[in-house]
């Protein structure tokens, strides 16, 4: 058997097709059992995220895996096949290591994918679709992803606006855990900002939004306080950090409002990060002595620098993934040789047992022991040398000197 992986992702298929081949969390358990039942080894792991669906098996039959996917989702071969990428053998291991390390992600080096791959592996184990090869492949992959994170800077630099905003705050304040943060807006970007802040130990967050119910829903998750936009002047003086991202056509925080808040703060510095377009914070706020205003353009230049840094780190990571996939395949080959040795020994022992049993029966019937012993030795020799003799004969007829040399070495004929 050999490793096979097929998949589609954001590079090869539209959102529409990705949705059609995705596996919902409540169905993926049974899907993995179904796919595993179609393989000779009973091994299958399915990774399904918003950006990719990938099927990993140890079947050696790529076409069968594709047929299963099409049948499961009731899709035509013409719709699915052109969007699939396929890997076999070592390429499977290398691809999985690249995916788990964020090297194949929409955002280069993003860490979330590793958690998603781990969840898929756990579900596969629960479904009983993991045996020795898949277990070793995924366990090795997790170690490689950790090695890449440790030995390269692939995940060190911020490459999203939300992450960059929080990274900037970390550079300015020695510890975010003691800061008070005002978030303006309650959309996806601000939610991501809140998550990064929470991960960095921020406990005091206020979320201001035009619709209070939307802010309250978000605050429940992060233990924050929800307020309306009209209440901002009351909470602004307590804020060390203000991060704003709304869809407002007009500025929400003006120079006068911020100036008044700074006076109440006795001119303690305030970091303001405006990641909205159009701006949420008046540009004139930057003129105030104790206000440090950054816009989305400032963050974008940081992101571009960081992306260059990640691309450089990705080159190092690619080398690690390739090296480690080679090592994994050495283990696979050693496993195959162990199986071959076991099969060869079993077959040889079966021949020996059969011939010994015949000899014992003949002895019991009064046969000549010396004659039977010689007959046993001859028959055993002939049986054991039959396969290598045939292989040497075929190689000689074909003029295959390489195979002849390998057979001579294996049979110990070239020993001095």
Curated annotation (Swiss-Prot):
Pathway as given in its UniProt record: Porphyrin-containing compound metabolism; protoporphyrin-IX biosynthesis; 5-aminolevulinate from L-glutamyl-tRNA(Glu): step 1/2
Pfam families assigned: GlutR_dimer, GlutR_N, Shikimate_DH
GO biological process, one term: protoporphyrinogen IX biosynthetic process from glutamate
EC number(s) per entry: 1.2.1.70
Signal peptide (UniProt feature, chain positions): none
GO molecular-function term, one example from the UniProt record: NADP binding
Annotated residues for binding of substrate: 49-52, 105, 110-112, 116
UniProt cross-references to InterPro entries, sorted A to Z: 4pyrrol_synth_GluRdtase, 4pyrrol_synth_GluRdtase_dimer, 4pyrrol_synth_GluRdtase_N, GluRdtase_CS, GluRdtase_dimer_dom_sf, GluRdtase_N_sf, NAD(P)-bd_dom_sf, Shikm_DH/Glu-tRNA_Rdtase
UniProt catalytic activity: (S)-4-amino-5-oxopentanoate + tRNA(Glu) + NADP(+) = L-glutamyl-tRNA(Glu) + NADPH + H(+)
Active-site positions on this chain: 50 (nucleophile)
SUPFAM superfamilies referenced in this protein's UniProt entry, alphabetically: Glutamyl tRNA-reductase catalytic, N-terminal domain, Glutamyl tRNA-reductase dimerization domain, NAD(P)-binding Rossmann-fold domains
Positions annotated to bind NADP(+): 185-190
Keyword list, A-Z: NADP, Oxidoreductase, Porphyrin biosynthesis
NCBIfam families: hemA
Note: During catalysis, the active site Cys acts as a nucleophile attacking the alpha-carbonyl group of tRNA-bound glutamate with the formation of a thioester intermediate between enzyme and glutamate, and the concomitant release of tRNA(Glu). The thioester intermediate is finally reduced by direct hydride transfer from NADPH, to form the product GSA.
Family: Belongs to the glutamyl-tRNA reductase family.
Domain description: Possesses an unusual extended V-shaped dimeric structure with each monomer consisting of three distinct domains arranged along a curved 'spinal' alpha-helix. The N-terminal catalytic domain specifically recognizes the glutamate moiety of the substrate. The second domain is the NADPH-binding domain, and the third C-terminal domain is responsible for dimerization.
Function: Catalyzes the NADPH-dependent reduction of glutamyl-tRNA(Glu) to glutamate 1-semialdehyde (GSA).
Subunit structure: Homodimer.
PANTHER family, per the entry: GLUTAMYL-TRNA REDUCTASE
Name this protein carries in UniProt: Glutamyl-tRNA reductase
Species classification: Bacteria, Pseudomonadati, Pseudomonadota, Gammaproteobacteria, Alteromonadales
This protein's encoding gene: hemA
